[in-house]
Amino acid sequence: MAEKSTLAASSALHLSFPPAASGVFHSRSITAVKVHPVALFSILDHYLRRDVSQPRVIGTLLGTRSESEVEVRNAFAVPHGESQDPWQIHLDAEHHRRMLDLHLRVRPDEVVLGWYSTNTELNSNSALIQDHYSRETAPHQAIHLTLNTNVADEANGLGVQCYVSALLGAMAKPEDCAFLSLPTHLLMSTPEQTALRHLAAPKPQNITDLDALKASLEDVQAKLDRVLTYVRRVLAGEVEGDKAVGRYLSDTIGVVPAGLDESLLESLFQSHLQDVFMVSYLSKLVSAQAEMSTRLVLLT
């Protein structure tokens, strides 16, 4: 599929970006890449299910693109094979196309952004794969995301890094390219942060609804204590106040209706607590009825 990479000697280094279509921002204007945890979990799941003889797994990145940033929201695996003597790569293009069609039926707002690899090494095969995905993302450049799966690497851990590519030389071959690093950030919503915190718990265990509510209240209380400590330190002049934090606190406090006394607030909380218990009771009742119905069917 490809010849061995050869670089001609020259006194100058030419970085050639493919020309962009008129009116379309080029990837050189990208300032950052934001990655959602869902995409990283998909990549790790693919890696754990790989053939042990594979040095790495690859797949397609999906998400949204703006003028200056790309947001990686999803990913799916693409079967492949590769060799180093000579440098060759084989991708299951039909599998890629079928998976992409299925995904776009559910999320038509997402586009192909590039590809991922679970090996941080960038070689000639990486350049060939990058060239393939560049055709998928044209006129934009393809994003290449690498995920370090070496858990023994305490310095970097599961390091995530994104790149774009630039051809070397005026008449360069697809495999003759340089990968240029981009700022990469992990983007998490509040529900995702909560889910990740529970996944990172050392000893997950089954807890009752009341225990879960108690843990949530204790977490809220701890956060309120942190906020009060910060505000008191700012008022005392111990630390310099952050305007962004002040605006956020003001907006948060503004959500609470004004004029609520302690008795009314407690009454509202008790009402909400009763609703929680009622929902929990009804869900257990439905579960018990379903189990009973299943056993009766087996008896008949």
From Swiss-Prot:
Which InterPro entries does its entry note?
A: eIF3f (IPR027531), EIF3F/CSN6-like_C (IPR024969), JAMM/MPN+_dom (IPR000555), MPN (IPR037518)
- Please provide, alphabetically and separated by semicolons, the GO molecular function terms listed in this UniProt record: metallopeptidase activity; translation initiation factor activity; translation initiation factor binding
Decide whether keyword Glycoprotein is in the record: no
Q: Which GO terms describe its biological process?
A: formation of cytoplasmic translation initiation complex
List the keywords (alphabetical): Cytoplasm, Initiation factor, Protein biosynthesis
Record carries keyword Endoplasmic reticulum: no
Q: Where in the cell is it found?
A: Cytoplasm
Per UniProt, residues of the MPN domain are: 33-169
Cellular component terms per the entry's GO annotation: eukaryotic 43S preinitiation complex; eukaryotic 48S preinitiation complex; eukaryotic translation initiation factor 3 complex, eIF3m
List the CDD domains hit by this protein, alphabetically: MPN_eIF3f (cd08064)
Report any Pfam family annotated for this entry: MitMem_reg
What family classification does the UniProt entry report for this protein?
Answer: Belongs to the eIF-3 subunit F family.
| Subunit-structure text | Component of the eukaryotic translation initiation factor 3 (eIF-3) complex.
| Protein task | Component of the eukaryotic translation initiation factor 3 (eIF-3) complex, which is involved in protein synthesis of a specialized repertoire of mRNAs and, together with other initiation factors, stimulates binding of mRNA and methionyl-tRNAi to the 40S ribosome. The eIF-3 complex specifically targets and initiates translation of a subset of mRNAs involved in cell proliferation.
What is the recorded name of this protein? Eukaryotic translation initiation factor 3 subunit F
Q: Which organism was this protein described from?
A: Malassezia globosa (strain ATCC MYA-4612 / CBS 7966)
| Source species taxonomy | Eukaryota, Fungi, Dikarya, Basidiomycota, Ustilaginomycotina
